[in-house]
Amino acid sequence: MNKVHFYFHSFLLILTINLVSSCNGQRQQPKESITEKTVTSSIQLKIKANKVIKPENGFNSGFLDSDGTLWFGSNGNGVYRYNGNSFQNYTEDDGLSSNQIYSIIEDKENNVWFGTQNGLSKYNRKIFTHVTIPFKDTTSVFLDKVYPVISPNAVHSLAQDKKGNLWIGTAGAGAYRYNGKDFTSYLSEIGTKQEDSLYHNWIPSIIEDTDGNIWFASMTHGGVSRYNGETHTQFMTKDGLSDDMVRTIYSDKSGKIWIGFNGNRKSGLTVYDGNSFKTYSVDDGLCNKLIRAIYEDKNSNLWLGAHLGNLCIFDGQNFSEFSSNGQTFSDILFILGDSEDNIWFGGINGIWKFNGQTVIKMTTDN
């Protein structure tokens, strides 16, 4: 199977659920290329209920903001806001750049940002604004063949650092840092060159660790990259990664970096302690090697969501599938905690809340 077919096959599966140092990957983008288009259409309350009808293709992402509000990004039906009592749905009709939502983050000014198939949307709690990223032109016949798998305009990951910078991971144009005025390009030439001799680096996950380093995952055979504010360090299989197609990264409370992969080769769950990498495989009890979501609970257990696999918990010694009244939970794409220590998880099959004793399904099928 060639790389194009592999990427496309991988993305279709998603839709159904839905050490080298360098600083030459960093480029400042001109101020005049930054444009904003404010959407003035009114925000209408579309759903008022303590449960919501599940979109046809489920959900991609979840986020808890500073007000305690939960946001859920869907596969094709916009974003859902939950205030603890009711859901409200926002779509392109309300100003979103796209109904396909991949990532959500909040900035220090209380704005909520959405990574979509058509770029960035900013919501100031009143109106949506489309923020144009000054992408380098990478148009080619190759992109037409693999769209929407590799799509430079799509924003698949978002993070905010301690300085307030917004970090943006695209599905084919590397990463960008946005300081509120200017965009700076990073890692556009990492990974494997494609048929058109361009890299089209796809970054599905970005985090900041406890030391303030920014970590980037690459799904186009670029491994992981760590940026300390001055230089990038790239980690590949030769450095200890179990695979170079990385799906998600997570920093736990102790500062360890946990890495989930696309499930190729002998990949599994890899942890970096600052000195070396260690990988847990299915032979070690790992429930599934296609890790899509990682979350640490208040008891330091790791919750692991997997594509084509069941929700799993790692207590530091053993892995076990999570179940409730005999029910397991498959294809979990996001996991997060709320202000009351409930754990929320979801994906193609809906959204659930676990209060420590009982699992409550927050979506209905009709």
Set out the residue ranges of the language-model regions:
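Carboxylate-rich, polar loop motifs that coordinate divalent cations or form catalytic acidic clusters
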Residues: 2-366
